[in-house]
Every structure is written in structure tokens, then in C-alpha cells.
Amino acid sequence: MKNLAGLMKQAQQMQQNMQEMQTRLEAMEIRGEAGAGLVKVTLSGKGEMKGIEIDPKLIDPNDAEMLQDLIVAAHRDAKSRLETLAAEEMQKVTGGISLPPGMKLPF
């Protein structure tokens, strides 16, 4: 019974640590780039787009498709960086313990 109480306490501490990590992530802004930095997208830690910067040299009414592709690529880059950062933070909180597929904390 004592071991069960200890496990429950550890689980509660991990849950609190994960909530703190989630709060830290939500406060962050992550930037992705494309076209050698000519298009930049900023996402919140929740993955919501906060801003976009486009170098004026790219604005060509005759070639909107290239600009559209670069915006998508910059967003994809920012999203990838966010996912990597979230995974790194999760490793810190869980001490490298992998959770079963589909299991998310807090419970």
C-alpha cells in the first residue's frame, strides 16, 4: 500500500510539472522561415498563427503561387519547431519515460 501511495504522489507531481510545462509552452512564440528567411511565420505555443512577415521583394502580382508556397513552407517549419520543442520539454518533465500511444497527461 505504501508503494501505491508513493506512485500516486509521483503521478501527481508529474501532472503538476506537465501543467507548468504546458503553461510555459503556451507563453512561447516560435518562428519558422522559408525562402532563406524572406517569409517568416510566428506561432504561439498553442500552434496559433500570431504573425507573418514577407520581404517586399517577394510581392509580385504575376507570381503569387511562389509566395503562397513559401508561406505554407514557413508555417510548416514553425509547426515542426514547435513539435520538437514540446517533445523536448516533455522529456524533461517525464524524465525520458515514454507514455503509451494515445495516453496524454495530465490524466
UniProtKB/Swiss-Prot annotation:
It comes from the Bacteria. The keyword Cytoplasm applies. SUPFAM superfamilies: YbaB-like (SSF82607). Transmembrane segments: none annotated. Its main location: cytoplasm. InterPro entries: YbaB-like_sf, YbaB/EbfC. Keywords: Cytoplasm, DNA-binding. One of its GO terms (molecular function) is DNA binding. One of its GO terms (cellular component) is cytosol. Pfam families: YbaB_DNA_bd. Homodimer. This is Nucleoid-associated protein Acry_1999. It comes from Acidiphilium cryptum (strain JF-5).
